[in-house]
Amino acid sequence: DLHLEMLRKLHYSVELGGFGSRHTPAEALACPALQDVRLSPALTGGAAESRRMKILLDGMISDCHKMGLRCLAEGIETKGQHELVLSLGADYAQGNYYAEPMTAAEFEDWSQSCPQICCLE
């Protein structure tokens, strides 16, 4: 935790990746240096098809916000998934729905034409 706190003081963002997968324990959310939580594509993809997964994702986003953490929904592939994570309050989203993987040069061109790169609005 001391090293993570040092990184925060140097203005680095401390994120927990893959949250909601079996490899990321819930107690990792208790780390005081943590700022952002990246929600697993297994959660975001499953929530569009399963009522229980949607309830689980909703609760995770809500609980993260209660702890002062921002949520990034990973693996967004469809408009339905985009609308779902937006309605549940995710702060950010990423996935092929927004853009396919690209080179740095392609990213420069793409970023000039896309006004909402960073936030769900």
Each model region followed by its residue ranges:
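EAL-family c-di-GMP phosphodiesterase catalytic domain
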Residues: 10-121
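Heptad-repeat coiled-coil signal-transmission/dimerization helices
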Residues: 1-4, 57
